[in-house]
Amino acid sequence: MKSRLLTVFALTFSIISPATATPNYTVGGDRPVTVNLPDTLANPAPLLILLHSASTSGAHQENYMHLGPVAKKNGLIYIAPDGMINPEGKRFWNASKSCCNRYKQEVDDVDYINSLIDEISKKTPVDPKRIYLIGHSNGAFMSFTFACKTNKVAAIVAIAGAMDTESDCTPSTPVSLLNIHGTADKTIKVTGGVMNNFPYTSATKTVKTIASVNKCSNLATSKKDFEPTIKGTETTVINYACNTHTHLQFWKIANGSHSPKLPTDFAEQVISFLLKQSK
């Protein structure tokens, strides 16, 4: 009788206990990055890649955006890799002529990100139709470049980024985009500018470039309170209607800075946008 009770208890405990999380692992060779896996891993599962701003790191960017817990809860494989280190000891992505390889170092970050995707895909079932990028500043430039040079990206969230004016950005397949930019950004100006002696696009031109690829038009405009330190509904949301399966939005933050204060539900907002997108 006692053994029977122990058996029943063991079965009951196994039913009510949560499943053991799949252990994280490292990829990337001499530029290692931790692959963060969700507790429940779909087959296949979406992959989220966070690309940091110049002079920071993947860990710093995660500390700013707090994507990890929300990615984990929503079944996303998640990585926040680091760019190369320049002679000043600062990290960067070799995204374009204007941003931000100041010392013209020989580094192919498109190849590096590709290699991360390939290495992860060999170990974990990545859904090739749901690969997402979130980039800030230099990381946003890198997100656009990677999407333009490969056909792997389903959607991008870009904060305070742009493209080279002379860029021939023509993704072979449509890419969904949520573009966020503050009008008071003094680093990457919303109206466009010059860095490293090369011009970069305005936020409007950046969005129009993707809109052309996605065959979008028929703008609808609304307001929202996004930046918590600016009073009122400071953010204009420009929503495009696209003739493809993609979605395109431009959130323009009135008086928003280069690194705007993010709302507490920022991760939920952007991951919700991404998870609606597929190639």
Residue ranges and their predicted role:
Residues L5-I15:
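Sec-dependent N-terminal signal peptides
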Residues I49-S55, A160, H181-G182, A254:
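The conserved beta1-alpha1 loop
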Residues S55, I85-N86, M163, D185, ...:
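Alpha/beta-hydrolase active-site loop signature
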Residues A19-A21:
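Boundary at the C-terminal end of the N-terminal hydrophobic targeting segment
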Residues S176-I180, V213-K279:
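C-terminal catalytic histidine-bearing segment of alpha/beta-hydrolase fold enzymes
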Residues N24-Y132, M142-T145, T264-A267:
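Serine-hydrolase catalytic machinery in alpha/beta-hydrolase-like enzymes
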Residues K122-P174:
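Primarily recognizes the serine-hydrolase "nucleophile elbow" in alpha/beta-hydrolase
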Residues A155-T221, E227-I230, N239-N243:
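The feature captures the conserved acid-bearing segment of alpha/beta-hydrolase catalytic domains
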